[in-house]
């Protein structure tokens, strides 16, 4: 297969699985990318897939406008290939000759020599004409867009707009190995530029996304990839150096790792219901040379995992709609259904109640989600406080976003971070 063709073929296949079969983008990329030897080809596949999913309504509108007959249900890969071509011209700014040539050749490799002239004609039209204009919420399911508008009013447009933009690559420098300024110099020596955050002393925003193998010291645990909003959780919890700490929904392990980098003497229990995902926590701990007690269990089933000794602090990063991280997971909008929300709310409620039972009087529970839905955030928090007499909320402060009831909400893109909700709860020592 000639240069440039393979990544277009892979991207078309991945997009067909994600868009037409409801597969996870992360899962399909994890399976497909290792088939490409060149890291540049892998990066191109990722860039194409993300661009297509962010701009999918525009490309679908173009196909509707330009095709005399709509593509059939059996044409998923062909539809994906056309969108691969659109993304190269529209977002990635690949030179038109290279984009058309490689995409047309990919059509042959995919087994459609009789469709080559068709693909070429559609892409040449995309080169000549302006793509249709669609609303910023066009990719969002109607029920979800309406809920965002009801929750956020005039700020809803900012949420939709931010979710269409690529997210920066945030790094977390492990200060056990050196200071942030020194690491910036190492990045510069590797040809990379980064901007420090004023909110988190370990945080750096890269000027472009790169494979982790290009990050100095990554394999040795000197740096990790973690969004700014997620990095802020450690400071909000601020456990004492030898505290007993529970991370109740720990996978993939970034927040637990950050807490242990800051305080390696923590007695941290990392809990997750999924064995495969918990293995990622173990791999992360091994890479950064810290230790945690790992436990596969449902956090709500206390009899299955808790020995009855209270924790000093609990982190509950609850399962949620992921509406705050659409810019990183654009396929969320393809998969999310209205009927998904109530089960999520029930799980969050049960997790809050169970985790609270494990917390000692005077202890701290931090509840976070990567959602922008009030039902999962401030409404969930208010309901918990109403039924829990010994719980009180502390304001996390302005660094964590705008007030949202008794918590704080960062909207997507604010301070460069993902959409995140934060609440800090204290267990009353007098009750």
From Swiss-Prot:
S-adenosyl-L-methionine binds at residues 249-255, 272, 298, 317. GO terms for cellular component: cytosol. It catalyses: cytidine(967) in 16S rRNA + S-adenosyl-L-methionine = 5-methylcytidine(967) in 16S rRNA + S-adenosyl-L-homocysteine + H(+). Its EC number is 2.1.1.176. CDD domains: AdoMet_MTases. The active site is at residue 370. Its main location: cytoplasm. InterPro entries: MeTrfase_RsmB-F_NOP2_cat (IPR049560), MeTrfase_RsmB-F_NOP2_dom (IPR001678), NusB-like_sf (IPR035926), NusB_RsmB_TIM44 (IPR006027), RCMT (IPR023267), rRNA_ssu_MeTfrase_B (IPR004573), RsmB-like_ferredoxin (IPR054728), RsmB/NOL1/NOP2-like_CS (IPR018314). NCBIfam families: PRK10901.1 (NF008149), rsmB (TIGR00563). This is Ribosomal RNA small subunit methyltransferase B. It comes from Xylella fastidiosa (strain Temecula1 / ATCC 700964).
């Amino acid at each position: 297969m000639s240069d440039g063709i393979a990544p277009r073929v892979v991207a078309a296949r991945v997009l067909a699985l994600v868009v037409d079969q409801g597969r996870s983008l992360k899962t399909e990329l994890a399976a497909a990318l290792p088939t490409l030897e060149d890291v540049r080809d892998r990066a191109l596949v990722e860039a194409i897939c993300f661009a297509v999913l962010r701009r999918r309504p525009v490309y679908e509108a173009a196909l509707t406008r330009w095709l005399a007959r709509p593509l059939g249900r059996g044409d998923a890969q062909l539809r994906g290939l056309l969108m691969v071509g659109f993304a190269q011209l529209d977002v990635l700014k690949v030179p038109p000759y290279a984009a058309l040539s490689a995409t047309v050749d990919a059509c042959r490799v995919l087994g459609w020599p009789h469709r080559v002239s068709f693909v070429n004609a559609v892409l040449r039209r995309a080169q000549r004409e302006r793509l249709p204009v669609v609303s910023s919420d066009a990719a969002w399911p109607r029920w979800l867009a309406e809920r965002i508008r009801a929750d956020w009013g005039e700020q809803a447009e900012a949420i939709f707009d931010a979710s269409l933009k690529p997210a920066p690559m945030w790094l977390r420098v492990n200060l056990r190995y050196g200071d942030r300024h020194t690491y910036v110099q190492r990045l510069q020596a590797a040809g990379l530029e980064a901007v420090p955050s004023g909110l988190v002393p370990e945080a750096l925003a890269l000027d472009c996304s790169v494979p982790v193998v290009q990050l100095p010291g990554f394999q040795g645990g000197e740096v990790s990839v973690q969004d700014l909003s997620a990095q802020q959780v450690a400071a909000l919890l601020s456990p004492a150096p030898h505290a007993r700490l529970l991370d109740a929904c720990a996978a993939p392990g970034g927040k637990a790792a950050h807490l242990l980098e800051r305080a390696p003497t923590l007695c941290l229990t990392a809990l997750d219901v999924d064995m495969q995902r918990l293995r990622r926590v173990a791999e992360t701990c091994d890479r950064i040379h810290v230790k945690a007690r790992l436990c596969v269990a449902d956090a709500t089933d206390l009899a299955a995992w808790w020995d009855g000794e209270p924790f000093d602090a609990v982190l509950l990063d609850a399962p949620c709609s992921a509406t705050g991280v659409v810019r990183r997971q654009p396929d969320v909008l393809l998969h999310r259904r209205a009927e998904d929300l109530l089960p999520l709310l029930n799980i969050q409620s049960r997790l809050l109640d169970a985790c609270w039972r494990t917390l000692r009087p005077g202890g701290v529970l931090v509840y976070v989600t990567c959602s922008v839905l009030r039902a999962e955030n401030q409404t969930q928090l208010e309901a918990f406080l109403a039924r829990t007499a010994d719980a009180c909320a502390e304001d996390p402060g302005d660094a964590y976003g705008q007030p949202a009831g008794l918590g704080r909400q960062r909207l997507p893109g604010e301070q460069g971070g993902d959409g995140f909700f934060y609440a800090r709860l204290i267990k009353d020592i007098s009750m």
